[in-house]
Amino acid sequence: MSVAEKVKEIIVDQLGVDAAEVNPDAKFVDDLGADSLDLTELIMAMEEEFGVEISDEDAQQIQKVQDAISFIEKKKGE
């Protein structure tokens, strides 16, 4: 499973949204209805799943689904 597919799966599980709504340009708050607690739980789930650390500063930059995918791919490539 690719990083993108796994990120999408985590988002569907954490936010309870339909997989069809989770596209690369979807914004977590505006499009997927996430609140600050949801965002924290998403970041924690991604850290656990991918074995990466996402700082608070980095987490604030992750606004869209593609932001999360790109960040994790970059971290895993280091």
Swiss-Prot record:
Keyword tags: Cytoplasm, Fatty acid biosynthesis, Fatty acid metabolism, Lipid biosynthesis, Lipid metabolism, Phosphopantetheine, Phosphoprotein
Subcellular location field: Cytoplasm
Pfam families per the UniProt record, alphabetical: PP-binding
Any single GO CC term annotated in Swiss-Prot or TrEMBL for this entry: membrane
GO molecular function: acyl binding; acyl carrier activity; phosphopantetheine binding
Annotated metabolic or biological route of this protein: Lipid metabolism; fatty acid biosynthesis
Superkingdom of this protein's organism: Bacteria
O-(pantetheine 4'-phosphoryl)serine, modified sites: S36
UniProt main location, coarse: cytoplasm
Chain ranges of the Carrier domain: 1-76
PTM (free text): 4'-phosphopantetheine is transferred from CoA to a specific serine of apo-ACP by AcpS. This modification is essential for activity because fatty acids are bound in thioester linkage to the sulfhydryl of the prosthetic group.
Biological processes per GO annotation: lipid A biosynthetic process
PANTHER family: ACYL CARRIER PROTEIN, CARRIER DOMAIN-CONTAINING PROTEIN
Family, per entry: Belongs to the acyl carrier protein (ACP) family.
Primary role: Carrier of the growing fatty acid chain in fatty acid biosynthesis.
UniProt-recorded name of the protein: Acyl carrier protein
Organism name: Solidesulfovibrio magneticus (strain ATCC 700980 / DSM 13731 / RS-1)
Gene encoding the protein: acpP
